[in-house]
From Swiss-Prot:
Cofactors required: FMN
Domain of life the protein comes from: Bacteria
Domain named Flavodoxin-like: residues: 2-137
Protein name in the entry: Flavodoxin
Alphabetized NCBIfam families for the sequence: flav_short (TIGR01753)
InterPro entries reported in the protein's UniProt record: Flav_short (IPR010087), Flavodoxin/NO_synth (IPR008254), Flavodoxin_CS (IPR001226), Flavoprotein-like_sf (IPR029039), NADH_oxidoreductase_modular (IPR051285)
Flavoprotein among keywords: yes
GO MF term set: electron transfer activity; FMN binding; oxidoreductase activity, acting on NAD(P)H
Family as reported in the entry's similarity comment: Belongs to the flavodoxin family.
Organism of derivation: Megasphaera elsdenii
Keywords: Electron transport, Flavoprotein, FMN, Transport
Function statement: Low-potential electron donor to a number of redox enzymes.
Length: 137
């Protein structure tokens, strides 16, 4: 089972989650997609393959009222998990994703892939690739 957990402010990261979910299903794996606000750390940590989505906020950082505290609580439970990261951005160069990937690797998790898209994804190959990687993980 692949668990997709995301936060979206404008709909772009949600669109990415939908594209990734479709790719996981097309690759033959079971998948569940949920917003950070609608799940809890223990449920997410119980999954073997976890895809986390958050757009770049502020000065290239994670959304700070929901995603950052959730990830901080989840981090100690990620050791040995297969984790993918995704998100959209409107400015900057994707530094938030590089930092998030490093933080995730520092937990002992294996990062199976990342996907970043400028603005709205439209059949973004990055989303398909991440979904396929998650299905095979």
């Amino acid at each position: 089972m692949v668990e997709i957990v995301y936060w979206s402010g404008t709909g772009n990261t949600e669109a990415m989650a939908n594209e990734i979910e479709a790719a996981v299903k097309a690759a033959g794996a079971d998948v569940e997609s949920v917003r950070f606000e609608d799940t809890n750390v223990d449920d997410v940590a119980s999954k073997d393959v976890i895809l986390l989505g958050c757009p770049a906020m502020g000065s290239e950082e994670l959304e700070d009222s929901v995603v950052e505290p959730f990830f901080t609580d989840l981090a100690p439970k990620l050791k040995g998990k297969k984790v993918g990261l995704f998100g959209s951005y409107g400015w900057g160069s994707g530094e938030w994703m590089d930092a998030w990937k490093q933080r995730t690797e520092d937990t002992g998790a294996t990062v199976i892939g990342t996907a970043i898209v400028n603005e709205m994804p439209d059949n973004a190959p990055e989303c398909k690739e991440l979904g396929e990687a998650a299905a095979k993980a």
